[in-house]
Amino acid sequence: MMNEIITSTQNPKVKHMLLLQQKSAERKKEGVFIVEGCQEITHCINNHLPIITLYYCRSLWDQDYSALLSQASQCIEVAEKVYEKMAYRGSTEGLMAIVETKTLSLHDLKLSESPLIIVLEKVEKPGNLGAILRSADAAHADAVIVCDPLTDIYNPNIIRSSVGAVFTVPCVACSSEECIAYLKKHDIQILTAQLQDSHLYYDIDMKRATSIIMGTESTGLTQQWRLAADAHIRIPMLGQIDSLNVSVSTAILLFEAVRQRQCANLS
């Protein structure tokens, strides 16, 4: 129902929302995450993620979002000062939702005939993961697999930087051991990004089932992945700096795979 209006920042529901915003452990415990803004909430709905509670502030609306409210199990109106207290970021059209987490396993993935998968080992920065998910959506990758993650996949910064791609790209968290076994079982070639003993990325055939493995910017990939690789690949560095941001590197490698596949379809 849409008849409750919260005007106090001391309301228990407001305090609960702030707890969820600030504590990853609390989000995991309740099996929920927080989404802000019309675009991100719409992506949740379109990808069948249940909206548990939708908070809204009419005075911040730039258009009528009543149709969006009808998609939530519960809608609660809040005063502008309350919304500003609850919001993690600005410019969210006065819309914020608690959404039920959808946890995928490797076995839930539905792969195409020649899948293209991004694997991230021990990704640290939420902004990088969000940007990579955005690139994965643009490249129509089959999945992003996060091995031994150091950040919550539904971290508010990941949701924001992915512009909702965290809901459109199948994303799985697992151990490196599980991921390697899965890729080997499905005959998906493993290409590890590293500078040493590697081929230029455009010299490798990525038209077949392919996984691109990215490590951390500080230490790269662990020996476990280097030993599991079918090939090591690198992006040529022509300046004085010997590395790129991991999200930029991932996008370059992803779209080389896309280029090769599109050229093959044209021939």
Name each region found by the language model:
Residues 62-72:
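Short, aromatic/basic amphipathic alpha-helical patches
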Residues 191-241:
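Active-site/ligand-binding-proximal alpha/beta "capping" segment
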Residues 37, 124-131, 245-249:
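Amphipathic alpha-helical repeat scaffolds
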Residues 73-99:
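Glycine/small-residue-rich loop that forms an oxyanion/phosphate-binding "nest" at active or ligand-binding sites
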Residues 1-62, 150-151:
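Boundary-proximal intrinsically disordered activation/regulatory segments immediately upstream
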Residues 46, 79, 103-197:
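RNA substrate-binding interface of SAM-dependent RNA methyltransferases
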